């Protein structure tokens, strides 16, 4: 059913065969043309003194990985790592370096918000992480310089209340910093933080969550808020914080590990008809519910995927599958093509479920969502994008999805892996 948030899904479900028109020969030209469109739309690059002012050349470096050109650099890096695009690898990496170097200059000149120095998706930590990846992919030994700056940010986010708005969520808080470290560990095949650093960050997250839950008299052990709101979803909420604690659970004391699992089960109990409200205690309105990566089942699914991969308990996989069913029904979102609250973000749930189950039904569903992105219905009925190049709201994240659709055994939501 068509609603104000989503298009009606009129596709037939899986009947035993994948779409013939979604092979490499068909999709690769779409990827290439979309990349070229993104690169043509990029704003002028600056950095340093040129970055002053919202309309200056350096404004392109604002917004971090989420909406700035740093996110485009990551997309180009991601494409360069695919054997399917080996011929363009060097060009894409060189372009990525140019973009991320502008962002590095903006960071080094102090033109960015001091509160986002250690932010993964909105600030410095993400810039340094992607610079490390791009430099390393180019074979440059000086990749250790941005890596060293990333490591140094551990001291910034170690104090329990280092941000007034909330110190623990994914975009600007400690969960994001741990997530960035996880990405670097995966791509560099080495742990980039010391055990002492990891334990310090995890302990700060735990202490913060315990203190908040006690202060607010919650009937569960860990809770957090961001700008005063008790979010549950992946963008700013409990689910991604718990996901990061599970990702580093070997660094937790057994008693704290138990608190994390209790909180995971508490969140599972908050499910309302295959979905979760944006904030704790809300009742979902079925005709107006959010089915986004940022708020709702398509993002919370990743926590339960991680819980399943660690524990092998079927209730966690069953929860992921229910998330996928709702996403199939309501995931053709009108907000655009992106991964935060768009069609590609919905489709990534199917690629996740394929990796968890091996069921080709989920590749088919992802193919259908990819197909829908290029229909006139979507183009005319979706929201006009503020930035077509944004990694999270625009087409850069969509490119990552299309690449991953061609290599589903390695597919994972950008910068948010549960398989590390």
From Swiss-Prot:
Disulfide bond sites: none
InterPro entries: 6hp_glycosidase-like_sf, LANC-like, LanC-like_prot_euk
SUPFAM superfamilies: LanC-like
Superkingdom, taxonomy of origin: Eukaryota
SMART domains: LANC_like (SM01260)
Family matches, as Gene3D superfamilies: 1.50.10.10
Alphabetical GO biological process terms: carbohydrate metabolic process; peptide modification
Family: Belongs to the LanC-like protein family.
Protein name per its UniProtKB record: LanC-like protein 3
Source species taxonomy: Eukaryota, Metazoa, Chordata, Craniata, Vertebrata
